[in-house]
Swiss-Prot record:
Function statement: Histone methyltransferase which is required for the mono- and dimethylation of 'Lys-9' of histone H3. This increases the efficiency of set-25-mediated trimethylation of histone H3 'Lys-9'. Involved in the transcriptional repression of lin-3 which is required for the negative regulation of vulval cell fate specification during postembryonic development.
Ranges of residues in domain Pre-SET: 971-1049
Name of the protein: Histone-lysine N-methyltransferase met-2
UniProt record, GO biological process: epigenetic regulation of gene expression; heterochromatin organization; meiotic cell cycle; methylation; negative regulation of gene expression; negative regulation of meiotic nuclear division; negative regulation of transcription by RNA polymerase II; negative regulation of vulval development
């Protein structure tokens, strides 16, 4: 057993402390085996060995391996007679005597106390130097990188100028070592260093280079190579693996980076070069080598280095050396005493002697039995020859011995016997055929005792596989293997075992197929900042090789997907090595073989009834439920599994994993067959390259996190649910299905986004032709477009003045406020004089004061916090919105709660105006909105859009029945005030109860529970289950009610303006707080059937299908809710449980699902299109049976139907139509809101004039703070007909603009 390297445990806190240069005394231990060979020593020599005690420290005797075997020889007696004290003394010579152990333990206690003290002092120092530490905290990544590079250059400059003798004896005890240990020039001339680098590059070895260039030792040689590499930025591309061997590892690199990033380190600080070497446990040459590696990596120069992971390192670093040595000594002494008590004859010797005696006696007995058997055989042969004489007339003798009847019977019996033999042979042949057919595949995947294999001790799909040797086959599902790295023997299931004797190169797989095949793949991952590690992970082959340019598409069990290249045919790289056949492989040869093969075949495979690979059963072999469900769905659709189109520049949300539903925004920067390469957003928006989309990115200063994602993965937000909505029966219209389908279908050409509100363009918008509807824009030069963009922003900002009020200090304080406190300045916020200012500015025109206070936080230099305090007309200070609410209540003010905002970003005084020459219409709403809606055009001379303005929605024609829009279809609340307490308002409780019926994950935004009602007339988050406002049935006060928002008039001033490229838009004329109501979207109410008939004029359609909205949101938030992922059920074959009830538990009325095994029919929702077809064929009320394959039927027979309640939307509304809003000919301000990839407005469904779930109002709320002059936009989520061959480009101008309006 080789001597182990000393383990050095360095306390970071003690090294980085500011006082003291001492380091911990480092202890070492030597593992050795006491091996006294009696044949080589006589009794006297053995006694001398025991008497010698401890050898002199530092001699070669400490590292010698003393070998010996305790046998049954009589000479052992002398050894056994030795007292145990001498034995302990001898053992202590290897592990250190008791006094040394006590000293080490004492020193450790002292060090622990010192460490605690140092940490306390360091904490005090950090508090005293708070500004210094804050500077390091607030630095950007770019600034931190610059500081790190400066430190690296300083340390390299010092280390490379060390005197040659200092490289060998580097214990700097001189306090002036920083100046006295170095020279003015590098230790080796730079030109000479370059020559050394070239020689090293050619030989790839350090051997002989020190003598060739007359260097004192190898450490100076390493330093010279680093100097040469740094001077040329490693143009030679030196392989650092040879240099780092036995010098540094990834642990050293990590320690080095930690030291450099520490704020109080540097060449001239207390934590200088000496502390650096102590902290990283390195010599000067190794320090130069580490700093060189980090500098090359920081600057993006070539740096070839792969650290091999060594699990022994961590084990050695964690050893308690004293405890380890004491345990060995105690065990050895105990064994010594036990042997003496048992007598002189050693137990092992006795057992060996007994064993050999048994062998000898058994051999003699066996020999005698064999001789007796041979003799008996010879006697029997001789007896047969004597008793049975030979004669030729056999048939004649038979004929003479039997009568005619007996002969006939014998002949018949022989005929029957021959017939039976023939039938038996035929049956055996048929049975053999069946056996061969069913077991060829199984025989292919069988391990043999003694074979190498890949196995995992931890039965988890995420765990990696390591090399092992087969010990025994326990049963058909279990093998006993011995792991090579740990020598453990364990029983492993065949789903955790992979073969090394077979691979993808085997011709037999051409017969079995590879789709659904369970495999283990070799993957190289990053194990540290500078190292890589090779592991084997299990997965499923998911695509035919020819469909992916000769690569295998692998779905790994841990949730990732990748292409894996593996040789399958002669001539391909690695084929000869991978396919080599030998009776015996060494471990090294086997590793080389598997590295070439890249893919190993798992022992456990999905075998069907016919004995072949059945990929429909693959999901049974995957333990993780989410991954198993995904594989199940994929194999059912194979090869028709759809891929989401992900063009470069597209932005999409990506889930962390199938289990972790947290989302991150990513940008598509490239594609690779069925994969898209996406770039994650940097946590710091100011980081270098945050908006870079180059792939590959060659800017060394950019820090990117790129990932390859399978375009059919359920980690892509909405992809699984959209595909599910298309492929299953639901209540989506064919028009909506076509829109969803287009996201998975190819498109041919791209066209510009039309001017959505331009009268001439409307007719051409969705015809599906190749005509370029924006040809006029295309014809314009870039200069003209730039001019249009500039003219678009020709507006003025004015400041709305406030009246002069009595100074606050002159107002008298009083205990109780009342109506008189309003100073007769109170007014209705809807008065005409407030139309040209922000509603939040209105209180300031009524005697209120809104004062911003800026205060220092005291945590960081320059960090401030801005607070808003309102002062009422009587001088009362109101610090929060609840104070304002109470004041309005007690004073009975006409001002409403939404006229107040504590958002410090809001500038209440700014108002946007335009020159009179650009004003086309003073009030486009013709007075219907209660506030003027001007229309302006500073871009061109186009006439105002042709639209009949309407504030309320209306029925399209007499065929549309909207009789449910009535107070008779509403329930009201019993509140007698302003409904400010949601817990007491029955209408707000309806909203809360509707939210509670949603799946649990849709009730939260991250870790925050969503609030399903207004808060002070603000909507903090979108409520997909819908909001219930108070209505005509309620007894609350209409104007002051906190739950009446959408039904009120527009409050914030806006105007319609002509944009440069997107037609007419809507601009905010004042600052608008987040969560504020903007306006509604109104138009003609159409039935869904009418909408399908008008599908070519659907550019102004808005679906009122609340259930559809909920289902799509479920798909975006957590698609496994729809598929049954993540539940407690283990029966993944439950087709009805997976598809039949998705999204139907939203509403209150519940029905029970029928048991398909009893009724013989499956309860399936009909699409509106199929319902219409059924009615035409006379089957309007019937329920269609779903087409199932024999496999589906077989699997369903084994599944118990679960009796769970769901709300059946279609049964509830089946006699009644669903509705769509069309604002093409007649509408309101909401019709002019344009699309944006980064919208500041979102849509909310609200019910107040009816509680008919089919007829909610469509309302717009701000999703973030809007500045005066900003355009109000929302995300259309617009998709085109699947038969269309064009795409619309987007000109929203957002930083994250995908460039596409139609998402194909």
């Amino acid at each position: 057993m080789d001597q182990q390297e000393p383990s050095n445990n360095v306390d970071t806190s003690s090294i980085l402390s500011d006082d003291g240069m001492e380091t911990q005394e480092q202890s070492s231990f030597v593992t050795a085996t006491i091996d006294l060979t009696v044949d080589d020593y006589d009794e006297t020599e053995i006694q001398e060995i025991l008497d010698n005690g401890k050898a002199e420290e530092g001699t070669d005797e400490d590292s010698d391996l003393v070998e010996g075997i305790l046998n049954a020889n009589s000479d052992v007696q002398a050894l056994l007679d030795a007292p145990s004290e001498q034995v302990a003394q001898a053992l202590n010579s290897f592990f250190g005597n008791e006094s040394e152990q006590e000293a080490v333990a004492a020193q450790r206690r002292v060090d622990a106390e010192k460490t605690a003290k140092d940490e306390a002092e360091l904490k005090q120092q950090e508090e005293a130097e708070d500004l210094i530490i804050e500077d390091s905290i607030v630095k950007t990544d770019e600034e931190k990188q610059a500081v790190r590079r400066l430190k690296i250059n300083e340390f390299l400059s010092w280390f490379t100028r060390l005197l040659p003798e200092q490289f060998k004896n580097f214990e700097f005890t001189n306090p002036n070592y920083l100046t006295e240990s170095i020279s003015d020039s590098p230790v080796v001339n730079v030109d000479k260093c370059k020559e050394i680098v070239k020689s090293f590059k050619e030989s790839e070895s350090l051997e002989g280079l020190s003598q060739k260039y007359e260097l004192i030792d190898e450490d100076v040689l390493v330093a010279a190579i680093c100097i040469g590499v740094l001077d040329t930025n490693n143009e030679e591309d030196v392989d650092f693996n040879v240099l780092c061997d036995d010098r540094i590892d990834d642990w050293s690199i990590e320690k080095c980076v930690t030291f450099l990033d520490y704020p109080n380190t540097g060449l001239n600080s207390k934590n200088g070069p000496l502390r650096f070497m102590q902290f990283t446990v390195t010599s000067p040459a190794s320090a130069i080598l580490m700093l060189t590696l980090i500098r090359l990596r920081e600057e993006g120069h070539p740096c070839r280095l792969d650290f091999d992971s060594n699990p022994t390192d961590d084990l050695l670093l964690n050893f308690d050396q004293v405890e380890f040595s004491n345990n060995i000594i105690d065990t050895a002494v105990k064994y010594w005493d036990d042997q003496k008590e048992n007598g002189a004859q050693d137990k092992i010797g006795r057992e060996l002697n007994d064993f050999f005696h048994e062998i000898e006696s058994t051999s003699a007995e066996f020999k005698q039995h064999f001789e007796n058997a041979v003799g008996s055989r010879n006697e029997i042969i001789q007896l047969v020859n004597e008793k049975i004489p030979d004669f030729d007339g056999t048939e004649a003798a038979v004929n003479e011995s039997f009568t005619s009847d007996q002969r006939t019977e014998i002949i018949n019996s022989r005929a029957i016997m021959e017939t039976l033999k023939a039938e038996m042979k035929l049956a055996i042949a048929e049975a053999q055929k069946v056996y061969d057919t069913k077991t060829d595949f199984e025989k292919f995947f069988v391990l043999t005792v003694g074979d190498f294999c890949l196995a995992r001790a931890n039965p988890s799909d995420d765990a990696e596989l390591t090399y092992a040797i087969v010990q025994d086959r326990v049963d058909a599902m279990t093998y006993k293997v011995k792991f090579i790295d740990t020598s453990q023997i364990r029983e492993c299931n065949i789903r955790d075992l992979a073969m090394t004797t077979q691979g993808m190169y085997d011709p037999s797989l051409n017969t079995f197929g590879d789709v659904g095949l369970r495999v283990a793949c070799r993957q190289v991952i990053s194990s540290s900042q500078f190292g890589k590690k090779t592991i084997w992970l299990t997965g499923t082959a998911a695509g035919r090789r020819r469909a992916h340019r000769s690569d295998f598409l692998i779905f790994f069990d841990n949730g990732t997907d990748a292409y894996v290249s593996a040789p399958t045919m002669p001539g391909e790289p690695g084929y000869e090595v991978a396919s080599e056949k030998k009776s015996v492989f060494s471990l090294k040869e086997m590793i080389a073989k598997m590295n070439a093969a890249q893919i190993a075949i798992m022992v456990g495979q999905p075998v069907g009834k016919e004995g072949n690979l059945d990929y429909f059963l693959t999901f049974h072999w995957i333990r993780q439920s989410h991954r198993s469900a995904y594989i199940r769905d994929f194999m059912k659709e194979f090869p028709e599994w759809p891929l989401l189109k992900m063009p470069v520049g597209m932005r999409i949300c990506l889930y962390n994993s199938l289990v972790d539903r947290r989302k991150k925004m990513v940008t598509v920067i490239g594609t690779d067959r069925a994969f898209a390469i996406v770039r994650h957003e940097a946590p710091n928006p100011l980081a270098p390259g945050n908006r870079c989309t180059d792939f590959p990115c060659n800017d060394r200063n950019h820090q990117h996190i790129d990932e390859k994602i399978y375009r059919g993965s359920h980690r892509l937000e909405g992809a699984a649910h959209k595909k599910h909505m298309i492929s299953t029966n639901n209540n989506l219209s064919q028009r909506r299905k076509d829109q969803l389908q287009s996201q998975f279908e190819p498109t041919d050409m791209i066209r510009s986004m039309p001017e959505r509100n331009h009268q001439q363009v409307v007719k051409k918008k969705t015809t599906g032709t190749n005509q370029n509807v924006a040809s006029t824009n295309d014809a314009k030069s870039k200069r003209e477009i730039e001019i249009r963009k500039k003219n678009q922003f020709l507006f003025n900002k004015i400041i709305v003045p406030i009246p002069v009020l009595t100074p606050l200090e002159n107002l008298k304080a009083h205990a109780q406020c009342g109506p008189d406190c309003l100073q007769k300045m109170d007014a209705d916020p809807y008065e005409a004089r407030f139309h040209r200012n922000s509603p939040i500015h209105t209180p300031l025109l009524c005697g209120w004061r809104r004062i911003m206070y800026t205060m220092s936080t005291g945590k960081k230099r320059g960090a401030v916090k801005k607070n808003i305090i309102y002062f009422s007309p009587c001088g009362a200070a109101l610090h929060q919105i609840s104070d304002v609410s109470e004041y309005i209540h007690v004073t009975r003010s006409l001002l409403t709660i939404d006229c107040f905002s504590f958002d410090a970003r809001i500038d209440t005084a700014t108002y946007i105006t335009v020159d009179d020459k650009y004003l086309k219409v003073a009030d486009f709403s013709l007075g219907t909105e209660g506030i003027p809606i001007p229309l302006v055009n500073s871009v061109d001379n186009d006439e105002p859009p042709s639209l009949e303005y309407s504030k309320r929605r209306f029925q399209y024609n007499d065929q549309v029945d909207i009789s449910s829009v009535s107070r008779d279809f509403c329930s009201g609340c019993s509140c007698d005030g302003d409904c400010s307490d949601a817990s007491k308002c029955e209408c707000q409780q309806l909203s809360i109860e509707a939210m509670k019926r949603l799946p649990h994950n849709l009730q939260f935004d991250g870790h925050d529970e969503l609030v399903p009602h207004y808060q002070n007339r603000l909507l903090s988050s979108k409520v997909i289950s819908g909001l219930y406002e108070c209505n005509d049935q309620c007894s609350c006060h209409r104007k002051s009610c906190y739950n009446r928002v959408v039904q009120n008039n527009i409050k914030y001033p806006m105007h319609i303006f002509k944009t440069a490229q997107s037609g007419w838009g809507v601009r905010a004329l004042t600052d608008i707080p987040q969560s504020t109501f903007i306006c509604t979207y109104v138009g003609a109410i159409l039935t869904d059937d009418l909408a399908d008939e008008l599908r070519n004029a659907d550019q102004y359609f808005a679906d009122l299908d609340l259930k559809d909205t909920v289902e799509l949101e479920k798909g975006r938030e957590d698609h496994e809710t729809d598929f049954g992922y993540g539940g407690d059920e283990s029966d993944y074959d439950d087709e009805e449980g997976s598809d039949g009830d998705s999204g139907d538990d939203v509403m209150n009325k519940m029905v029970k699902r029928q048991d398909s095994s009893e009724s013989g029919e499956e309860t399936k929702r009909l699409t509106r299109q199929k319902r219409k077809q059924s009615k035409k064929s006379g089957k309007g009320g019937s329920v269609e049976k779903d087409d199932t394959t024999p496999r589906d039927s077989m699997e369903k027979d084994n599944i118990e139907s679960k009796d769970e309640p769901v709300f059946n939307w279609d049964k509830y509304f089946e006699p009644f139509p669903l509705y769509v809003i069309d604002a093409k000919q007649r509408g309101n301000l909401g019709r002019f809101l344009n699309h944006s990839c980064d919208p500041n407005v979102h849509v909310q469904h609200v019910m107040y004039d009816t509680h008919d779930l089919r007829l909610p109002w469509v309302a717009f709320f701000t999703r973030k703070y809007v500045k005066a002059g900003d355009e109000l936009t929302w995300d259309y989520q617009y998709t085109q007909d699947q038969t269309a061959t064009t795409q619309l480009t987007c000109h929203c101008g957002a930083e994250n603009c995908t460039g596409r309006l139609l998402k194909s």
